[in-house]
Every structure is written in structure tokens, then in C-alpha cells.
A protein has these predicted regions:
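Generic surface-pattern signal
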Residues: 89, 93, 113-116, 131-135, ...
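Acidic/His-rich structured neighborhood in mature extracellular/periplasmic domains
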Residues: 16, 21-129
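Short, Φ-rich (hydrophobic/aromatic) sequence segments
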Residues: 79, 83, 87, 133, ...
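A cross-kingdom marker for long, charged
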Residues: 137-172
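Start-of-domain marker
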Residues: 1-21
């Protein structure tokens, strides 16, 4: 089943020719079982998006070569791939306990091999407290395993049972 999501790139400034500074808004939702409702899963804003792009240039991502040949050009596809894996991981977590783990590992691989270059931020622990590094770190760190239990409990045992067993859903 397709995951309903949106990526909105808001270009804030042109740093130099074909180099842009932007904010990325990411949203994702999942269906609530037995209803026509959608439940919001992700609503995040990433202010650290700097990338190089020339009109009509294809966005290509290679998981084996995250940095590509040019860090500026590789950054935007790496950011999109990172958030795609995070969304898929959270979606799987909402249907199966710790079901998203393989996708979180893929997102972590992108962080560990992220493009590095002039003006590129958001991939390192010292780039702030609300960035791509800390998001995947908090989801993959064993100390925070309760996050997966809560996510699964809220969506699968809670919202998905509101139609057929409201008492059980509210106790979850």
C-alpha cells in the first residue's frame, strides 16, 4: 500500500549560482483500519537543506555512493532518501512491533555516509539538536526502544481498534 506523504521544498536564498538554501517540510500519514480516516505519523521541518541543482538535472541517489561525485549535488537526493526511509520505517513500526528497524538502519547508513561540503549541515551531531543525525540516532538507539512500543501501541492497538473495540483501543 502506498504511504501518503509530502515533501515541500521552500527555497529561502540562492547562495551562489545553482546553489540553494532551503527548508524542507515533511509530512506523512497512514490509514486507520476500518475507516476512511488518515492518522498523521510525521510532521517535521528541516531548516538545514543546502543543495546544488541545475535546471532539468535528474535527482539520482545511489545507496552505495551516498556522497556521489559532488557533495552539493548529492545532498538533496540523500536528504530525500533519508526521509523516505524514516517514513517507511515509521509506517512499518505502526503496523508491526519494531517492523521499521531495517529502514531505520538504511537511514542511519545515509547519515554515516552523508555528503560533506561547503554549507552542508544537518548530518552531524554537532549541527544542532533537531537534525537528521539526532532523529535517526534517537530511533535506533536501544535506550529508546520504548518509542517503538509506543508507536505500535498508539497506531495498531489504539487507532486501528477504535471502530471495532473502542474500550480496548482506549486502554492501549
Amino acid at each position: 500500500e502506498k504511504i501518503e506523504c509530502s515533501f515541500i521544498v521552500n527555497i529561502e536564498s540562492i547562495v551562489e549560482t545553482n546553489v540553494y538554501k532551503a527548508t524542507l517540510s515533511i509530512q506523512a500519514a497512514r490509514p486507520v483500519y476500518g475507516s476512511s480516516y488518515k492518522a498523521s505519523m510525521v510532521n517535521f521541518q528541516d531548516p538545514d537543506v543546502t543543495f546544488k541543482y541545475q535546471e532539468f538535472q535528474p535527482l539520482e541517489f545511489n545507496e552505495a555512493r551516498v556522497q556521489g561525485t559532488d557533495a552539493g549535488t548529492a545532498n538533496l537526493p540523500a536528504i530525500f532518501a533519508y526521509y523516505a526511509y524514516m517514513i517507511i520505517g515509521l509506517d512499518y513500526d505502526s503496523f508491526a512491533l519494531k517492523g521499521g528497524e531495517p529502514y531505520f538502519r538504511k537511514a542511519l547508513n545515509i547519515v554515516n555516509n552523508a555528503p560533506e561540503g561547503k554549507g552542508i549541515q544537518g548530518w552531524k551531531m554537532f549541527d544542532g539538536l533537531r537534525n537528521r543525525f539526532w532523529l535517526v540516532e534517537n530511533v535506533t538507539n536501544a535506550r529508546n526502544n520504548v518509542i517503538h512500543d509506543i508507536f505500535y501501541g498508539y497506531y495498531r492497538n489504539g487507532l486501528d481498534h477504535l471502530i471495532d473495540n473502542e474500550t480496548l483501543a482506549q486502554s492501549s
